[in-house]
Amino acid sequence: MERDGEQAGQGPRHGPAGNGRELESPAAASLLAPMDLGEEPLEKAERARTAKDPNTYKVLSLVLSVCVLTTILGCIFGLKPSCAKEVKSCKGRCFERTFSNCRCDAACVSLGNCCLDFQETCVEPTHIWTCNKFRCGEKRLSRFVCSCADDCKAHNDCCINYSSVCQEKKSWVEEACETIDAPQCPAEFESPPTLLFSLDGFRAEYLHTWGGLLPVISKLKNCGTYTKNMRPVYPTKTFPNHYSIVTGLYPESHGIIDNKMYDPKMNASFSLKSKEKFNPLWYKGQPIWVTANHQEVRSGTYFWPGSDVEIDGILPDIYKVYNGSVPFEERILAVLEWLQLPSYERPHFYTLYLEEPDSSGHSHGPVSSEVIKALQKVDHIVGMLMDGLKDLGLDKCLNLILISDHGMEQGSCKKYVYLNKYLGDVNNVKVVYGPAARLRPTEVPETYYSFNYEALAKNLSCRETNQHFRPYLKHFLPKRLHFAKNDRIEPLTFYLDPQWQLALNPSERKYCGSGFHGSDNLFSNMQALFIGYGPAFKHGAEVDSFENIEVYNLMCDLLGLIPAPNNESHGSLNHLLKKPIYTPSHPKEESFLSQCPIKSVSSDLGCTCDPSIVPIMDFEKQFNLTTDAVEDVYSMTVPNGRPRNLQKQHRVCLLHQQQFLTGYSLDLLMPLWTSYTFLSNDQFSTDDFSNCLYQDLRIPLSPMHKCSYYKSTSKLSYGFLTPPRLNRVSRQIYSEALLTSNIVPMYQSFQVIWQYLHDTVLRRYAQERNGVNVVSGPVFDFDYDGRYDSSEILKQNTRVIRSQENLIPTHFFIVLTSCKQLSESPLKCTALESSAFLLPHRPDNIESCTHGKQESAWVEELLALHRARVTDVELITGLSFYQDRQESVSELLRLKTHLPIFSQED
């Protein structure tokens, strides 16, 4: 750096620096020569006589004036040449103490004499990470965060957009979309790296609405693989979702069930601002950087929940302890620097995390100018990344996953529920407030498990008309939420309507009128962002929505890793990739089918059937079907293949009827499933089939098969899996559906839901979808883990009713399958669509607050709340569907894991 006051092509300063003295000019020296003190005495005397002449004084005065003027001009033009040449700009003069009519050093601010461009030229480059035309060709200064000097390439300190701004090359966003048929990587990269980049709180709708203001993200969307909605996990909070993305696990499985939580066994509380956040005991499962470490693949994380914690004793190879004050640009540059490390140090997997637009959404709400500014900011940051990758030759090499953890909702102080309004004294309870609130006693851990949560739930149920919250014992929550099997989830939880939140009292919550998240993961405003871009992803593809737990396996495939056990369906995202890496296969059936020949003796069931119903006169003739008849039954009842049983050592036999097929459990003495097809022109009769059963001689007779067994029980009865009221060919179908092999124990309160489902919903589906195939059956999930129960758990939960052991289902499932093409029959679809439900089987309908409501309203609401993935049904029943289909297994997994979102109007 040159000295102060000097510029290229200028002479040195005149006079000793700092003493205020300056050397005489040659002109002044010659004029002062007659006054030299070294003259002889006679000459002095002569001069003295001459000086008495008045004209002499005038001449001397004139000479002295000229000398002074010459000296001043010499100072101006000889000593300060820089002032005349450049006095208006700081370019090339930043922080140098040059003295002119404007200055460019730090003191100019207090003196008030800065050049007009001081801020833009000298100050902004200390914290701005981009070039502009004015900065091009600037002088390099160490205090600038990046350089726009002409030699910045040689010094490797250029701002990321230097090439596009100063060399007039196209930026990444200015280039046209290009199909990347194969990775185009620098020689030092053996395979494409993967970068997982999170924009916290980026609601999916933001891109739908403001995409025109987000050129970089919009280009990634248009050139890569994109889904309009990626489904977060519940609760839709930051830590649970980020950790689910990198583990493939639901919060109940990986342990991070909220941003704030209490563990009764550890007797410790977790929050984002506490030291407990760094305690590895909170983190279960295996995040992808640990998976990578186990398989000798390096990783680098610039922030990610859990990445600064020693999980399983392992940290990423390069990581940063979270610090929200680090500028976004610095994070981008760091990752770009990591990508330039030697191969033996360079990570193969990377994460990046930005707090926006979540922070602005919380402060100002999702529909605000501040959020739009935040979106434009993160779009600019993503653009920096893409330009940086382009400069490194990695823009056609690296696989980028641009993702968010959840959406954002507008809060309102008028849409907050306070429990003290209903409970009065609330000193003995504590509530984790928000849209997914939870309650526990204050005395913990002593009373955590013994507290009477059930009584409190009943007390808070149906207190008001159109109540906006529902108290749930956690095992009654919709199974699709997967939010029960963890002690950190309090036994009493609250489900809130869209836009609503709950707290103990007003003083407990922080704010109410700004943005929030945490609600049901099917609400449209909770949906998240997903874009995949790079050589592995399809070009310009838009895919159906999927859940973020599926991303872990996808990343493992991109990195060549074997995934750790997780909750995902490996291969369900194969349709995002040009060349899928993993090929899934159907699970093998674990229990072979047993025989159920006709061997029972007819007995009196204590039933009274309507005389109009045609009874079964010759059981063997009617149900001992020929091979051709069996094939006809298969094609009509299970056109997509019969469900396979994945439960080990479970005796099941197939029972063929003319109009439906049954998988009957000889261990449970009830059907595991029945399957039939409801065609668009089928009708339901209005006949009464109560108190009418026919004995199925192919199965052992049980007291629970008799009408007399249920006559003295006020709440428990039986229900039919295949509805007897379905009218197709003749009255003979009635007697088939009235067989004892078609009934299950069912609460009378639930029969209302079950009948509406068959009489109304199935009929509507059949008419709208040109027919529908139906598979339904009981569910047993007493340990509420979303998996089918073992025989030991079933035995522990068997109830004795009227001296008879009875196993009452916890839920009932129903899977509806139709054709994607409405012109096709469900008996022969080229492509499928499916819907599924897991309905809680309870002795009352308190969940729905039925008083004063139309049956159609509350049942439809209940069905919507308890919809599920087909995969959820498979996990909880031990069944596997669609195994006879011709589609690839990955395509079937795509179908099974799909779940439509709720619009805000639903």
Swiss-Prot record:
Residues binding dTMP: T238, N259, Y322, D358, H406, H517
Outcome of mutating N624K: In strain: Lewis
Cofactor(s) required, per the database record: Zn(2+)
Phenotype when changing V774I: In strain: Lewis
Nuclease-like domain, as annotated region: 635-906
Residues flagged as site, Essential for catalytic activity: K896
Activity regulation comment: At low concentrations of ATP, a phosphorylated intermediate is formed which inhibits further hydrolysis.
GO cellular component annotations of the record: apical dendrite; basal dendrite; basolateral plasma membrane; cell body; cell projection; cell surface; extracellular region; extracellular space
Site (Cleavage): A84, K85
Top-level taxon: Eukaryota
Annotated binding of Zn(2+) 1, by residue: D200, T238, D405, H406
Annotated positions binding GMP: T238, N259, L272, K277, Y322, D358, H406, H517
Region Phosphodiesterase, annotated ranges: 173-573
Domain SMB: 86-126, 127-170
Region entry Disordered, spans: 1-25
Record topology, Cytoplasmic segments: 1-58
Residues on Extracellular side: 80-906
Cofactor binding: number and manner: Binds 2 Zn(2+) ions per subunit.
InterPro entries, A to Z: Alkaline_phosphatase_core_sf, DNA/RNA_non-sp_Endonuclease_sf, Endo_G_ENPP1-like_dom, ENPP1-3/EXOG-like_nuc-like, His-Me_finger_sf, Phosphodiest/P_Trfase, SMB_chordata, Somatomedin_B-like_dom_sf
Region listing for Linker, in residue ranges: 579-628
Residues modified as Phosphothreonine: T238
PANTHER family: ECTONUCLEOTIDE PYROPHOSPHATASE/PHOSPHODIESTERASE (PTHR10151), ECTONUCLEOTIDE PYROPHOSPHATASE_PHOSPHODIESTERASE FAMILY MEMBER 1 (PTHR10151:SF77)
UniProt protein name: Ectonucleotide pyrophosphatase/phosphodiesterase family member 1
Species of origin: Rattus norvegicus
Gene giving rise to this polypeptide: Enpp1
